[in-house]
From Swiss-Prot:
It comes from Oceanobacillus iheyensis (strain DSM 14371 / CIP 107618 / JCM 11309 / KCTC 3954 / HTE831). Residues 502-803 form the UvrD-like helicase C-terminal domain. This is ATP-dependent helicase/nuclease subunit A. GO terms for cellular component: cytosol; DNA helicase complex. Its cofactor is Mg(2+). Belongs to the helicase family. AddA subfamily. It comes from the Bacteria. Its EC number is 3.1.-.-, 5.6.2.4. The keyword S-adenosyl-L-methionine does not apply. PANTHER family: ATP-DEPENDENT HELICASE_NUCLEASE SUBUNIT A (PTHR11070:SF48), UVRD / RECB / PCRA DNA HELICASE FAMILY MEMBER (PTHR11070). The keyword Transit peptide does not apply.
Amino acid sequence: MVNWTKEQEEAIYTSGSDILVAAAAGSGKTAVLVERIIQKLLAEHNPTNIDALLVVTFTNAAAQEMRNRVGAALEQALAANPSSIHLKKQLSLLQRASISTLHSFCLDIVKKNAYILDIDPSFRIADDMEMDLLKQEVLDDLLEEWYGDSNPNQDSFFEVVNRFTSDRSDAEMEELIRSLHTFAMQSPWPNQWLDKLVQTYNIPEEWTEEELPWMNVLRDEVSRQLDAVSQEIDIAYSITQEADGPYHYAKTIEEEKAIIQEALKNMESWKYLQQSMLQVKFGKLSGKKVDCDEEKKTKVKKLRDSYKKRFQKMQEVWFARNLDAHVYDMRVLAPVIKHLVELVKQFQDSFAKVKKEKAVVDFSDLEHYCLQILIDESSTEEEVIPSTVAMQLQRQFTEVLVDEYQDTNMVQETILQLISDRQGSGNMFMVGDVKQSIYRFRHAEPSLFIDKYKRFSNSDDPSIRIDLARNFRSRENVLLGANYIFRQLFDEDLGEISYDDAAELIYGNKMYDDHPLEAKPELLLIDNNSEDVEQSDNEETVEDLEKAQIEARAYAKQIKNWIGTPEDEIPMQVVDKATGKQRDLQYKDIVILMRSMTWASTIADELQQQGIPTYADLSTGYFEAIEIKVMLSFLKVIDNPRQDIPLASILRSPIIGLEEDQLASIRLADRKASFYEAVQRYLQNEQDNSDTVKSLIRFMEMLNDFRQSARQGSLSELIWDIYRETGYYDFVGAIPGGKQRQANLRALYDRARGYESTSFRGLYRFLRFIERMEERGKDLGAARALSEQEDVVRIMTIHKSKGLEFPIVILGGMNKEFNQRDLSEKYLLHKDLGFASKYIDPVKRIQYPTLYYHAVRQAKFRDMLSEEIRVLYVALTRAKEKLLMVGTVPSIEKKLEKWQRIVDHPSWVLPAYFRMESKTYLDWVGPALLRHVGSEKIRTENIGNQVLESINQDPSDWQITMNHALDYMDMKDSSMDNDDNLKEKVFNWESVETEQEGLKNDVDARLSYEYAYKQATVFRAKQSVTELKRQQEVKDDYSDQQILPPSHGPIGKRPNFLQKKLKLSPAEKGTALHTVMQHLPMTHVLSEPEIEENIEKMVLEEKLTRMEADSINIRAVERFFHTEIASKIISGNDMHREVPFSIMLPASEVYANWKDQSNEKVLIQGVIDCLLQADTGWIILDYKTDFIEDNPTSQKEQELIHRYQTQMTLYRRAIEQIWKQPVEQTYLYFFSQQLLIEVPYRD
């Protein structure tokens, strides 16, 4: 019985209104959601039917897990109350219940209402590959049309091209249209969103600032910057007022503060604000010599330089040109933007038309089609009216439950609102955590959650907010550490939510109390400053190492300490979730989280060199893998052999294996022609039988065969033929990394099959698709060659780790800068502010950002930083027992100096300007921890009394460690060192002595070792009943003793492709007849037509092939139903068919020649055709398809009994030993003669 907390119970049982459950990390939100569903189904009064609930999950896996949990609860309830009709009904409805992703729900709605949309109801969902190909095809056709002379708007089109693309290719134009299309489709009203882009630039002649909504973003940002300037001025001024402060600076600073205050008064008007900002001139500080503290004097100067620089930057960037000039620039761009939008709409129409013709959709189409069905035709963007279908769904669903609500986008929100009850007080139950909303790149809209989060806590709103803050994942020290960090980072400015008492993580898993662990959350700082470092004997220097290598070695050192060694160190103990007890730490308990995977390959290599098994699921590197390069080159040559580089690479590859001098000789055969023609000329000229000629002849024959296959067969078959005929697949499996290399080759085959399952065909188009992916910088990622349970340290992105948990988390690359590349493009896109382009003059060849561009950039920048704080929250909350953050910095001293400027900030949350100017996670976490009482050792000055008392009293217990990169110089793989020493001695002709005197004797002993149980090596440890029966038949030493006698024919069932070409063997016919007897109904005497009908059904169900079905003697089967044994079966006795068993028997009983005195046992396996319940036990029936002569004599029957005596005896022993019930009789039934023989028991 689960002990739910008060808040969890409230979330499970509260009803009657819209409910938002703000569930912190590790708070058991999925369990609560499932329990709510179960309790609604099991309620004593007015229980809900499961088909009256719509449950929306984020992934298919989550939906299936939820369905399984609900099913298990229903089965348990039904076991306790087997007569409940309601529970039986719920179980029958479960598989059809609406528990799915929103995309699956949309698919169901669209399929059922396809007639409304006038689309083919048999449409299929295309994958990303096919959609990419379709988009490219449509763009190619449209660009050809737009560039054509018949285009009436050619001049307008060229205007767009000249402003937004280079003269090298149309790639930028294509990407621009793709981006605008993708962004538009994230709106419930895509065409209206595009129209608004044009409206933004169509500024009237007489305009006011109120008509420029994007100006509010800039005003807010200027206000924040001026507040930051004021704060720095206040700090500087307060220092001048101290007893030994630089008081002679006070007057200048005070005057500058007054100017800033004046500027803040003009925030309502940009014109007046600009005037006041540009009037500010910073004078020089007094040069008067006074007796004051030099440190304080320097600090005031640095503070003044900081706010002066901040202010001057605003003057230069935002106020250098007046607003009228910026508006004029936008008016100039207006017609260009208008035509660009027309191009995007034309692309959308053409793309939609092509998808309709091919009857394919993507996930975005599903959402928009669903929306079209649910929205009444009279709806507008301002007033959304539900359609008849939507109102039917509102009546059907008594509650709509949404998991991971923080990741919902506007289209999905509109769909959910249309099918939920808007007439009453609401019936939506939403679960999520906005602090974990990290999918803005997928257009997730955290503001939807935040709006409800604020509104539902208002007493005037009937809706309810429930906070689940109790964390059941992590140890208390991990939670306290996370709380300490995020109280200083989250607020409504950045992170978009305050980290108040309701948002804090509360320790909930008391299981850890029984297993204390000294493992503080830790920040490891690595100083990579190579200056003033003494030279060491080590040849490797700090400069030689990348940051990734340094950090990887730091990880390795920590991991080795945690794992321990068999000789001297005890492994760290972690609590096993399944048992609740402590166990040794394993590699798979450790994860290394990175913001991106750019370092992953280097880190994995370094860890593996240190003997630490590691796996990184890379999203890049697939096309760079040598085996993929070779295969793509081969495919290119098959497509067109007159491609010199691919052809040369294939000839040089292990597939053909020519050396450089051989390739040179071929080139000399014809220097001017293509390399393929040079190969042909070489073969014509060279009449000898050299290795080169043999290799080239073999290659040309192979190439001709493959080119023929490419014209006639499928692409995937061609690829597999290459693997098989060249042996390349086996070859790469035998070289280092073979498992991964083969996985990559299989992935190429799978991707080719996926390509062919689309509406596209052909080798050329497949290769062109791959080339375009490479041109756009896309990669497929190496194929996965690792199971989830393998004991390795995993490297993954923070995004991949969401929803997972690990005993130990290493968060690496803390000092890697945030990715801001998107903020410097020619154009920026924002869901609310639209499309902001730099002003581009193609004639003067100049471009510069407009004020509108600055506004959109600032909004995107703030959104990006808010997301980064949430990503950091996800990372820190993955840890169950130990959290280690690692950052490598060029100079710790300079970092500490920067961080210490704000440690005395008078509130918990770090200043907004400081957080916004931070470029790395370390620049957030570092100053936060520098305020911690545990950081006294690393502070460069005594600032303890300047920190807030509540911060000093915080219960978190952090460990801050500082190392130098030099500490990781001596961590080269020891085996490599030994190899290097050995090579050096051999090179210098020095004697090589072994370190162990007894090494020779040890080697001799191992080479002459004899296994103590020789006899066990020549007898099988596992036997089938059929094989034992064969050994009894053939009384010779060969069959009786050899463990693996040579095979004289195919073992087991032949593959389907062979079955289609050959006749069935007698054994295969027998197997087919056994399949028929296994699946035929035994409820009455079957006639021949009934038997034939059932066999056809088995073919349709793919239980039999057509050839197997045709081999069945239907007359023989029909005769079986007229036997005495069949009558017993039909009479209703308990009967089991195809009963598998395994039993252990002493080897001496199984093998007549067994002479060993050991207690060896043999595993016997078999399958009993039919078991029939008798009065006091069981009857065994075994079907035989042996051909026997007509009217067999009693002597012949005795021979048959003798042949199968061993088999039937083993069957009897198995049933009696396993089922603990006696076997009364054992029978053989021979179909060829309708003969039933009883086999007596032989002890």
